[in-house]
Amino acid sequence: MSTGNILVVDDEPDIRQIVQEILEDENYAITTAENAVAARAAYNTHRPDLVLLDIWMPDTDGITLLKEWASTGQLTMPVVMMSGHGTIETAVEATR
């Protein structure tokens, strides 16, 4: 039995895979997306309980996607922003 649905959004396949494996070992149902287009589709299909969202992605960055979800009333779940290239400024922007 799943303990919750988590959407993992990251353009790096290795990151998606390792996060998915770790969370599936804890009985979470995981959906992955490699970019904002796939994340939008996965959100609409699976309605996740939590989103792990990469800040830096090539098409649309995670902060833009987060703001989009907030402005359209779709931000109904917690979102954890992730980045291997973060800065203080980026972290502050993600919290706005």
Segments predicted by a language model, with ranges:
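His-Asp phosphorelay/catalytic-motif detector in bacterial-type signaling
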Residues: 3, 47-49, 73-78
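Acidic catalytic/metal-coordinating carboxylates
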Residues: 4, 34-38, 61-64
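The short loop immediately C-terminal to the conserved phospho-acceptor aspartate in CheY-like receiver
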Residues: 12, 29, 55-56, 80-81
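Two-component/phosphorelay signaling modules centered on CheY-like receiver
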Residues: 13-31
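The feature encodes the CheY-like receiver
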Residues: 16, 58, 72, 83, ...
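Alpha4 helix (beta4-alpha4-beta5 surface) of REC/receiver domains from two-component response regulators
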Residues: 17, 64, 86-96
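Short amphipathic alpha-helix used as the core "switch/output" element in two-component signaling
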Residues: 41, 63-75, 93
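Active-site beta3 strand of CheY-like receiver
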Residues: 46-52, 57
